[in-house]
């Protein structure tokens, strides 16, 4: 008899992906969350998964309860009721750690690039053999017959510690989540602890000296552009159609590859995937074939064109990610003006990385800023304002609101890159509506 799973906070990116996966494996799945629309809920609705408003009435003892990591008894009535009644529940990462033991699991960790790399690895492997996966953009696939499970391993609050994968990629480490981590050394220690739990193979970006300090019982393979790495991407050609490159292992060419993706970071992501699958014994000709058809993941360089205007939506909310996204935009659109519209995410991150944000955004030709999106875990105490960031940006910068995005019209032959982890998509939708109305009025 199949179980019924109840997700407290089902619209969370990891939670929605896990819910979809369990649903596809034949289990009954339901969940609760706030009414506000979030991009992950579309997949749940299409699958027929019930999404309820938070209420203790949703809870019964016979449910398998999975709680999102952000929820506590003092901020969620369902979890408070579960604890009061003494019902058993698991946190998302605890459940996932137990769940993956039935598969050969492949994790993707790193400060940046986790979701894109997980998506790429899952895409290639599922087209070669039956594979379940869980991606941080809210998508998941569950198959009862799968041998492999590809998943995203999140370092925040050390959530990846219940995971003991056979293989894992670590794309990079960087100081982020200043509300939890005390500094880069704290971040490194978390990743090092995770690395010790990997069993058969660890694939690490080799051009960050700090990452060479990571230790593990599993064999470590380094990848990158430099000859000192085990897996090396060479003979790179970056065009408006994507990136072509060869990969060498122990000085021998193992294949020629094309990814329809932009930016140096996506070549590195692909090289990590190739390295992992090569060590697993997967046919490189099949890997090359399926790399070509990767269409990306949600909210990672997602493009749309409205009346000849190119709009890019990206989750970038850290300076390193902003630089990578703008680099990708320049590769694909070398003759266009790059206009960045950025919403800082959390006051703690904005304060901690103010100068770095200013430097990163200055890679664009023009910059527009939205008000800082505070997290539910923090209070705006006035320590930092978006105007403080605007004052540090070298390029032309201005402020926009959801109600007034018309300053964005002051550009010809431009690509508009909307970036952020908050509600930046509201600004994007306002701009799209403005463009649509202009088109209607000129017809």
Swiss-Prot record:
The residues that the entry says bind ATP are: 110-116
Localisation: Cytoplasm
Which terms in the GO cellular component ontology are assigned? Answer: cytoplasm
Q: What is its main location?
A: cytoplasm
Q: Where is the signal peptide?
A: none
One GO term of the biological process aspect: regulation of cell shape
What does the protein in this record do? Cell wall formation.
Name the UniProt record assigns to this protein: UDP-N-acetylmuramate--L-alanine ligase
Q: Which organism is it from?
A: Streptococcus agalactiae serotype Ia (strain ATCC 27591 / A909 / CDC SS700)
Lineage, uppermost ranks: Bacteria, Bacillati, Bacillota, Bacilli, Lactobacillales
